[in-house]
UniProtKB/Swiss-Prot annotation:
It comes from Bacillus cereus (strain AH820). SUPFAM superfamilies: Anticodon-binding domain of a subclass of class I aminoacyl-tRNA synthetases, Methionyl-tRNA synthetase (MetRS), Zn-domain, Nucleotidylyl transferase. This is Methionine--tRNA ligase. InterPro entries: aa-tRNA-synth_I_CS, Anticodon_Met, Met-tRNA_ligase_1, Met-tRNA_synth, Methionyl/Leucyl_tRNA_Synth, MetRS_core, MetRS_Zn, Rossmann-like_a/b/a_fold. Its cofactor is Zn(2+). Monomer.
Length: 544
């Protein structure tokens, strides 16, 4: 089976925060799992280097947009690598390859009659002497009356036109823009109304889209899909490949989602492999992002794919809700966020991954709390998982000189592990990552209970053979926990694999155990709870 996984493209205008990672982490879990299953996986993403936010940041700092994009793209790559993300291709939207692919898609849509020209009114700033792209216009949402950008309201998820906003202001200078006529290209989105309606009905029946994606898309379909501009007067981006319109750029909402397609083509060129199997209609596809990106993946991208004749529209939409910080809405402008480069300097990446999975905003907003983060590490990763691994392997090191005791796998334990693989695998495929991880940790707690009840420290003297059986089965459990947890906690799983000399990485019960155990090190270190106050002081002290 061919598995295509697309992770949303973060804007390269500032550092990643935990909200980004909470929404993107499911993609890596899926990729690792399906590779272990032996499936053909293509997992792609990249940095959005063409968006208006980059141009705004560059103007604020007095540097070029390219400098801003380079800085944060490199930082993103480093952060994703340090968090264990296993992208097959992580690229950027200002690459020559991406520009060519997007222009080809634009021309195909134009040739098929899905794009047309239209004279429209657009916000124009007399002070800045330029037409204002949607994100350059800010004001009040006409639907919910909250603060909003010209392209979308984060409060109610409404897709907006800048002219819809109340109390419009230029983001660059704060003046009120005038309205002037200009010519733009439009995408005939309304012609895909019935196909999008069918897609969301199928997703509702099969449960392959998150509830928020189903509800929001049903709302758009009920209201009627409206044609959308596909060109804008932007300072950076992909030029319109039509004579006389080269100064205009392809609008980011259609350009950025086409990044999945361009990254796939780039991967094929770089590896010499064929990517057509990921777009032939038979592939299982997963699109992973936050709920603010739902319309681009449930409406826009399917329509583009239908328009260019590609058979695979999003089968699974994994759209997480929002992550708050200490019960407050995350705000990058106010510096109310936990920044990824910062937290990675001081904490184990598996601790970050664990917390963001068990507290994932899969169906509702969830909160990141420093207290909960540190206590979950100490109680679950160290106290449950690390404790079971350490007490077992240290026992072998101390009483058997590192030589693996002889034994046979307990039938009940074997059956329990086989059922666990099946249950966890099904949960991952259904994008129920929290359920999957909690199931494994239920088994970890069972393993600790098994160790306590068997009392190998007493068995060693009273019944040495039984003691060997106990420890042998504990190592069997550890080997399988490492394998089951690899999609979630890859770093600690790798440490266990090295200690146990495990070579097999397939998604199946591990029955081959080592002959000896070497160099037993603690799987996790305790975090001093005094760090809670230190982190809170740092967080509150940085608020703007």
């Amino acid at each position: 089976m061919s598995i295509f996984i697309g992770g949303a493209w973060p804007y390269a205008n500032g550092s990643l925060h935990l909200g980004h990672i909470a929404s993107l982490l499911p993609g890596d879990i899926l990729a690792r799992y399906y590779r272990a299953k032996g499936e053909n996986v293509l997992y792609v993403s990249g940095s959005d280097c063409n968006g208006t936010p980059i141009a705004i940041r560059a103007k604020q700092e007095g540097v070029t947009a390219k400098e801003i994009a380079n800085k944060y793209h490199e930082e993103f790559e480093r952060c994703f690598r340090n968090l264990g993300f296993t992208y097959d291709c992580y690229t950027r939207t200002d690459s020559e390859h991406h520009h060519e692919t997007v222009q080809n898609v634009f021309l195909r849509l134009l040739e098929e009659g899905h794009i047309y020209k239209k004279t429209v009114e657009q916000a124009y700033c007399e002070t800045c002497t330029q037409f204002l792209p949607d994100r350059y216009v800010e004001g009040v949402c006409p639907h919910c009356h909250e603060e909003a950008r010209g392209d979308q309201c984060d409060a109610c998820s409404a897709i907006l036109d800048p002219l819809d906003l109340l109390e419009k202001k230029c983001k660059l200078c704060g003046s009120t823009p005038s309205i002037q006529e200009t010519e733009h290209f439009y995408f005939a989105l309304h012609t895909f109304q019935e196909q999008i309606k069918t897609a969301v009905e199928i997703a509702k029946q099969t449960g392959t889209w998150r509830d928020n994606a189903i509800q929001l898309t049903e709302r758009y379909v009920k209201e009627g899909l409206l044609d959308r501009a596909v060109s804008r007067d932007l300072p950076i981006g992909v030029p319109i490949p039509v004579e006389g319109y080269e100064d205009k750029k392809i609008y980011v909402w259609i350009e950025a989602v086409t990044g999945y397609y361009s990254a796939s083509k780039h991967w094929a060129e770089e590896t010499g492999k064929d990517d057509r199997e990921f777009w032939d209609g038979e592939a299982k596809t997963y699109y992973v992002h936050g709920k603010d990106n739902i319309p681009f993946h449930s409406v826009i991208w399917p329509a583009v794919l239908l328009g260019i004749g590609e058979g695979t529209i999003p089968r699974h939409i994994v759209s997480n809700e929002y992550l708050t910080v200490e019960k407050r809405k995350l705000s990058t402008s106010k510096n109310w966020a936990v920044w990824v480069p910062d937290i990675l300097e001081r904490y184990d990446p598996d601790s970050i991954r664990y917390f963001l999975i068990v507290n994932a905003p899969e169906n509702r907003d969830t909160d990141f709390s420093w207290r909960e983060f540190i206590y979950s590490h100490n109680s679950e990763l160290l106290g449950a998982y690390g404790n079971f691994v350490n007490r077992t392997l240290k026992f072998i090191e101390k009483y058997y000189g590192g030589i693996m005791p002889k034994g046979s796998i307990d039938v009940e334990l074997k059956d329990k592990i086989e059922r666990l693989y099946k249950h966890v695998g099904e949960a991952i495929e259904q994008t129920k990552f929290k359920v999957a991880l909690e199931s494994i940790f239920d088994a970890v707690r069972f393993a600790n209970k098994y160790f306590d009840e068997r009392q190998p420290w007493k068995e060693r003297e009273d019944d040495p053979v039984s003691c060997e059986e106990t420890i042998y089965n504990c190592v069997y459990l550890i080997a399988n926990f490492a394998n089951l947890l690899e999609p979630f906690l890859p770093f600690s799983s790798e440490r266990i694999r090295n200690t146990l000399s495990i070579v097999n990485r397939n998604w199946e019960p591990q029955h081959t155990l080592p002959s000896r155990i070497d160099s037993v090190q603690p799987l996790f270190e305790r975090i001093d709870v005094k760090q809670i106050e230190c982190e809170l002081e740092k967080l509150y002290g940085a608020v703007k």
